[in-house]
């Protein structure tokens, strides 16, 4: 493939010749806020429709989220493959035990106490050398990357930034995206990074620009499995709905079978939520006691400091050594 051909792909299918150009489908590196939101003006929220992300999402919907047209699905597959390739090159620079995931719902408001708690957890862990990973959307996901973005600053500065975000409490409120960009301008981040892994399947939920590195996929199943696989250093589960519950059991199965050659910590934030409202925590404990699950590293607390300690207590020396095979 040569640059003079604009890296075009040709193939024959059903006696038709398709030409798939990589003007935006093939990536050599991950997105960041500048590239994903190229063309977005924080002073004009309506400019989202014509920015890069808005354009891709509109095309995704118009072409069919579940399209069977090979001329549609092949470019998406090529794009996702290139994203995965860039993602694992990026992760190659990290010790797998320093990659920590956060799972939780998009419904968490910026004004919720849990939003600040997630941000503080992420901030502390980032300052301890962890790479924080989430699904890269709003709610608990945004809180993860907001906290990582504020790493290296005081808690008072985090609270000042949070006050700026409260002008748009949820992603459905006008100004949600613009306020994030204003915070990023007011509190620039040059030292710490975080990884968001969003999807255009949920493109109506905008990707948080606080993630410094963004692996955005068309295929949601690849994206979900990737988060759970790369977060060898542990997963923090925050209140969510059906998707979060699914991810809890995906992670439990992965740890039980040691898919990544190690059981990673599963730290739950929200005692009442995970023991009463959606009682998955006592269920997992019971399954462990009856030998149905093995080697799950479970903990639960409402205190951000407790959760940080649980994650930091997980050391490579305490587990079976794994090579950096997933990150190469």
List the predicted regions and their residue ranges.
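Short beta-strand segments
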Residues: 101-105, 135, 196-199, 238-239, ...
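C-terminal functional extensions of proteins
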Residues: 227-229, 263-328
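Glycine-rich beta-alpha loop segments
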Residues: 1, 11-178, 183
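Short, charged/polar "capping" segments at the starts of alpha-helices
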Residues: 7, 110, 204, 273-279
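Acidic/glycine-enriched connector segments
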Residues: 139-237
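Short, acidic/small-residue loops that bind anionic groups at enzyme active sites
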Residues: 129, 156-165, 238-239, 245, ...
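Short acidic, glycine/serine/threonine-rich loops at helix termini
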Residues: 113, 144-148, 207, 247-250, ...
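Short, solvent-exposed amphipathic alpha-helical segments in soluble enzyme
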Residues: 118-121, 212, 250-255, 282-286, ...
